Amino acid sequence: MDIAEEAAKNSYSPYSRFPVGAALECSDGTVFTGCNVENAALGSTICAERTAACKAVSEGHRDFVRIAIWGESRDYCMPCGACRQFLSEFSTEMEVLCAKAGGRYVSYKLRELLPHTFNY
């Protein structure tokens, strides 16, 4: 979770002022980080989870086992619907750790957060 919190420091979030960081672990132990990157055209914003996943895929990794998501919030920082669907393309069994300020976190399997994925 510390790695995800550290990744949030690189966030570009001038509109929401809500920095988020993610650390995505692959089956070989490689970890890819990501942060949210906002844009004035809000639909162009990319979440921390998808940033980390795109970095992993671009480096040849698709075997995701765990993702930690950290946001400076009183509530647990849960992945949005788009991120849930995006990650499910690679594994519905991956562990999703959702943290909040103060170091507490909850853990789910991705399939619990998105029980009915879209498949083409």
For each predicted feature, which ranges?
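C-terminal binding/interaction regions
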Residues: 1-10, 59-120
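Small-residue (primarily alanine) positions within well-ordered alpha-helices
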Residues: 4, 22-23, 52, 56
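Short Gly/Pro-enriched turn/cap motifs at secondary-structure boundaries
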Residues: 12-15
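Short beta-strand scaffold segments in enzyme catalytic cores
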Residues: 17-26
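Local cysteine-cluster metal-coordination motifs and their immediate loop/turn environment
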Residues: 35, 43-50, 54, 75-90
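Residue-level structural signal for beta-strand termini and adjacent loop
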Residues: 36-37, 110
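A short acidic/small-residue loop/turn micro-motif
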Residues: 39-40, 113
